[in-house]
Amino acid sequence: MDQQRLTHLKQLEAESIHIIREVAAEFDNPVMMYSIGKDSSVMLHLARKAFYPGKIPFPLLHVDTDWKFREMIEFRDRTAEKYGFELLVHKNPEGLAMGCSPFTHGSSKHTDIMKTQGLKQALNKYGFDAAFGGARRDEEKSRAKERVYSFRDKNHTWDPKNQRPELWKTYNGQVNKGESIRVFPLSNWTELDIWQYIYLENIEIVPLYLAAKRPVVERDGMLIMVDDDRMKLKEGEVIEEKSVRFRTLGCYPLTGAIESEANTLTGIIEEMLVATSSERQGRAIDHDQSGSMELKKRQGYF
């Protein structure tokens, strides 16, 4: 393929499809993580393209913390039914039994129990040797230095000092029994690339990304949407209706919205062209401590 004849987005698309096909051919039991966000929607679209007109030859896995936005779960189930892919949903039973939540256990412990430990449980349960993730290098500094093929040991931990060289488009997927690879087909995409691709390819996304009047409270410098009656107000907090949207989606008590009037894809793209902050600023889990994302990744987080 003549790369010079391809547009920037088509080059990114071709690279991602190449990676997805490479993993499907090279590994015995791959899985695609599906977190329901914009990056997952793009990755799903690329996987469908990679194997069209056939079906995606591996399942999608959602590690459900039980605290996702209701609209996310509705979108997940609707999308799985529409496209007919195999969807696996895992909730950490131990976390559920102890009533783990962002309010009772704090953001760091909740994320470790319900996301990191839940993910490791699911990977062990199904014996996956490769797992696709939608992380991008422009999101956060620890992700910026991670390879496309990210080696994980038998405990699913990551050692950033023990990464394999990736020369040109040659990836080393050699693993021993019990070891695995996390694969990031969107590594070289930016947030703006994602939104432009969604617009050009007409990819469906969770409506929470579009601005609308929503009930929010201001907490710890973030606008937190009140998604259900489990959200307990602190003294002095008042629920307000504001026009907001989300740049990133996670557990609703830990995800901050931004005030915006961008209720169309073109409006979002216009905002991205002048944005000066990272989308991850809206994630409370990234502010637990200095280097918190790298620490979480070392422990097995995506």
From Swiss-Prot:
Primary enzyme class: transferase
Name of the protein: Sulfate adenylyltransferase subunit 2
Stretch list, region Disordered: 280-302
Function: With CysN forms the ATP sulfurylase (ATPS) that catalyzes the adenylation of sulfate producing adenosine 5'-phosphosulfate (APS) and diphosphate, the first enzymatic step in sulfur assimilation pathway. APS synthesis involves the formation of a high-energy phosphoric-sulfuric acid anhydride bond driven by GTP hydrolysis by CysN coupled to ATP hydrolysis by CysD.
EC number in record: 2.7.7.4
Disulfide bonds: none
NCBIfam families from the UniProt entry: CysD, PRK05253.1, PRK12563.1
Similarity-based family: Belongs to the PAPS reductase family. CysD subfamily.
GO molecular function: ATP binding; sulfate adenylyltransferase (ATP) activity
Subunit structure: Heterodimer composed of CysD, the smaller subunit, and CysN.
PANTHER family, per database record: SULFATE ADENYLYLTRANSFERASE SUBUNIT 2
Pfam family, one: PAPS_reduct
Keyword Nucleotide-binding assigned: yes
Keywords: ATP-binding, Nucleotide-binding, Nucleotidyltransferase, Transferase
The organism of origin for this protein: Vibrio vulnificus (strain YJ016)
Pathway assigned to this chain's UniProt record: Sulfur metabolism; hydrogen sulfide biosynthesis; sulfite from sulfate: step 1/3
One Gene Ontology biological process: sulfate assimilation
KW Transferase (keyword) present: yes
Catalytic activity: sulfate + ATP + H(+) = adenosine 5'-phosphosulfate + diphosphate
